[in-house]
Amino acid sequence: MSKVVDLVRPVVETIIDEHGDMLVDMEYVKEKGQNYLRIYVDRQPNGIDIDEIAALSELVSEKLDTIDPDPLPDPYVLELSSPGAERPIKTEADWKRALNDYVHIGLYQKIDDKKVYEGTLKYYNNDEIVLEVKDKTRRKKLTIPRKLIAKIRFAIEF
């Protein structure tokens, strides 16, 4: 199904870029017998509003209908939305944006007897990250190998 995404991504990205927005992610999935093309869009620095999402959805829908040959020959539902405040960190741009931000991390194996951490991302490279975490009444820096990270996403600190 990613072949569909590969075919429509350039078209969708052009429309989104022309409006000063950013394509965060895109997926084409089948759920309960229904195909969905999901497009996640954001705007820096304050996020994207519902009116802009609606306008982009209309433009993307119209443009997708003109592509020949049709990369989406089966019926599908187009969903355009914001990725949300707690979106996954996937791309290099996401990693840059996450620097000095609060994140949630799930690990493949335990470090210091825990598989889940939340804290401020202080540093990253291809091999490891440094996370500042609360340890009772103080803060400490924890170095985590990237190969141990199962999931990482933005998080809201309470």
UniProtKB/Swiss-Prot annotation:
One of its GO terms (cellular component) is cytosol. InterPro entries: Ribosome_maturation_RimP, RimP_C, RimP_C_sf, RimP_N, RimP_N_sf. Keywords: Cytoplasm, Ribosome biogenesis. It comes from the Bacteria. It is found in: Cytoplasm. One of its GO terms (biological process) is ribosomal small subunit assembly. Its main location: cytoplasm. Belongs to the RimP family. Required for maturation of 30S ribosomal subunits. This is Ribosome maturation factor RimP. It comes from Lactobacillus helveticus (strain DPC 4571). The gene is rimP.
